[in-house]
Amino acid sequence: MARIDLNALPEPMREVMAAYADPASLTRRSLAVVTPPLDHNRPQEQAAEMPATNGICTARALARFYAALIGEVDGHRILTAETLAAATAEQARGMDRILRVPVRIGTGFGLPTPDAFWYSPTAFGFPGRGGSLGFADPATGLAFGYVMNRVEEG
């Protein structure tokens, strides 16, 4: 396994990587529960149904999903405006004890913190493994999806 120079990482990333390296930390105990670690590039693991992980799609499909949450796409809307308002109402905020970053959480979606590049008071969405991101902003009508071709560690 390649060693990572923690000093070369930005401070927030350095902290989470140091916590992950500590077998006694809550971060390590929470994220290293699968042995051997999953390889999200293997078709067998992509076919498995695992909550909160392995949502596999194209960037266009992810953006269209978020667009259908905030309005009609091809005549279909997934959530009513009332349900969306309830799902995006802030329920909690604070420091994530696992990832060691500030978070805001709605009933059904993540909410951006003010330092997130996609921040808007009305935006909602979730980052994903490896740097993927899906979000929407009902106030502007923007829906966005970014995914990678492969999941790479580090």
Spans of features found by a protein language model:
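Catalytic loop of the DD-peptidase/beta-lactamase superfamily, centered on the K-T-G motif
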Residues: 1-154
